[in-house]
């Protein structure tokens, strides 16, 4: 890809739109699956939990989340109208039954009351938050006492080598994330560092180091 194409690819990752956005969302279902599973493991979901996800994309992973326990309820937030529509279409039966609920938001203030959710998950979205510290405070606000949040993200040392992250991305490392969560009043439960094989757009397999940080509200 030339520079212009790389920049556009990065913008699509931040805010998928149009046919290209739908294609990228399908790709992310595959490339994000390991991180999504690891973050879900860190949540320790139990029966009856109410879940919130920030940046769900087309939400092709919803069945995996809902299979973790019984009587779960899922809420998804997206800044991308196309992803909101695609996730709603793809999971129409669960929307109709009230198990899944999808919403658009502007990317900063979460449109929910205090202490609404038992578990919060977000995968590869933190780079696009306008103010990561403020968002961590928002996540803490909507989390129930005893609730758990899990954030999964590529480590800065790896992400900075990817040419499409030069624009639209604010790269982070796990120590920064730990600090933001602690300043939001949360207690760190786990900081997990992992490496997985992922396929690039050219088909090459590369090692991707990533982190999962989980925290609870006492």
Briefly describe each language-model feature range.
Residues 1-20, 30:
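N-terminal, positively charged/glycine-rich alpha-helical extensions of SAM-dependent methyltransferases
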Residues 119-132:
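A short SAM/SAH-binding and catalytic strip from SAM-dependent methyltransferases
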Residues 108-119:
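A short acidic, Gly/Pro-enriched loop at the edge of an enzyme's catalytic core
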Residues 197-218:
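Core SAM-dependent methyltransferase catalytic element
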Residues 133-145:
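A short glycine-rich, Lys/Arg-flanked "PGG" loop and its adjoining helix->strand segment in the class I
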Residues 148-178:
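Conserved class I S-adenosyl-L-methionine
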Residues 50-109:
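Class I SAM-dependent methyltransferase SAM/SAH-binding core
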Residues 30-49:
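Conserved alpha-helix/loop element of class I SAM-dependent methyltransferases that forms part
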